[in-house]
Amino acid sequence: MNSLRLEPISRVAGEVNLPGSKSVSNRALLLAALARGTTRLTNLLDSDDIRHMLAALTQLGVKYKLSADKTECTVHGLGRSFAVSAPVNLFLGNAGTAMRPLCAALCLGSGEYMLGGEPRMEERPIGHLVDCLALKGAHIQYLKKDGYPPLVVDAKGLWGGDVHVDGSVSSQFLTAFLMAAPAMAPVIPRIHIKGELVSKPYIDITLHIMNSSGVVIEHDNYKLFYIKGNQSIVSPGDFLVEGDASSASYFLAAGAIKGKVRVTGIGKHSIGDIHFADVLERMGARITWGDDFIEAEQGPLHGVDMDMNHIPDXAMTIAXVALFAEGPTSIRNIYNWRVKETDRLHAMATDVRKLGVSEEGDLHYITVTPPTQLKHAEIDTYKHHRIAMCFSLVALSDIAVTINDPGCTSKTFPDYFDKLASVSQAV
């Protein structure tokens, strides 16, 4: 296994321009494929998850042209649901942003599709979504364990009418239904949410992209979603993929801990995990908001006790910032960490203990109490890109840190460590 030793960083300063958002990129690609007309996507993320979506779209008969640097993609929309004459086997890696929405979208058309991926994908639940789709006429069969991929979709279309979606496990279940809803007939559904909807900013991302594609969806405090009738997905022409607010969190955290960093490609009107900056501000960092940037500057940091369900990705970075804060930090209402690309709660708890950090928690929270002195540790990333990136911040202390399998950042941010080095000054 490859590893990367990061030597202590004395200070960070500078500006980082963000790559496109993974969540936005894959949603936009799927909608562009289904839309009437041609869509030009710019600032597309070039990463493993996006490559899996593009490969799937190719197998589904979608034509597109990718620029040499893979950040611009012109997609020729089908203007209809997917239809194939022979069975198609789609390998989706560990990309939940491809697996869940594609599962629903494929049910709208015709043909037989096998959806599978890496071993971890077989541990990521999809049963709530499949159950809802089955109530609307979907024919889906599990190939191994009930409730989990791999699975086979025998597509024959979906019925309309009201549906109840469990929002407590993953917002991607709701996203999948929202993206499929305009094509459901004869009655466009109302979507009722069971439980407390997790990761609401990611639903805002879905609603924004669908609105750009001609589909207006309204909601009642995230409890009931209304899709107006007589709407169809149409190309927006040009669509700019916004920077990844979750990726911004590492650089904003670095500025809050030891210097001053400006991140461009997102701003005060952005959606997604930008509320991470609000948490940094509550911890004592100085935050400046612009239309197209967010800047974080070092301040005396103190621990917080907060519900961070709305920022599930960036909350991991808060666990790393907590190592530099005065007093304990409690990150609450994060049960859905356990059903991400890896069991994030287990991974975070295991790795912070290696650093000499006092940690406690259960299925729903983690509390981190920093020691007087961190210890050098080899951080196991569990093939999880965000674990690699958030633990890189340990180098902002006076000890080095070793990141095992640093290449796992290719899922969302292939050149992350180069970008970190560009704003870092060695001790």
Curated annotation (Swiss-Prot):
Protein's cellular compartments: Cytoplasm
E.C. number(s) listed in UniProt: 2.5.1.19
Active site, renumbered: 313 (proton acceptor)
Binding site for 3-phosphoshikimate: 22-23, 27, 170-172, 199, 313, 336, 340
UniProt entry keywords in alphabetical sequence: Amino-acid biosynthesis, Aromatic amino acid biosynthesis, Cytoplasm, Transferase
Residues annotated as binding phosphoenolpyruvate: 22, 96, 124, 172, 344, 386, 411
Biological pathway: Metabolic intermediate biosynthesis; chorismate biosynthesis; chorismate from D-erythrose 4-phosphate and phosphoenolpyruvate: step 6/7
Pfam families with a match to the protein in the record: EPSP_synthase (PF00275)
InterPro entries, per database record: Enolpyruvate_Tfrase_dom, Enolpyruvate_Tfrase_sf, EPSP_synthase, EPSP_synthase_CS, RNA3'P_cycl/enolpyr_Trfase_a/b
Record HAMAP family: EPSP_synth
Function: Catalyzes the transfer of the enolpyruvyl moiety of phosphoenolpyruvate (PEP) to the 5-hydroxyl of shikimate-3-phosphate (S3P) to produce enolpyruvyl shikimate-3-phosphate and inorganic phosphate.
This protein's name: 3-phosphoshikimate 1-carboxyvinyltransferase
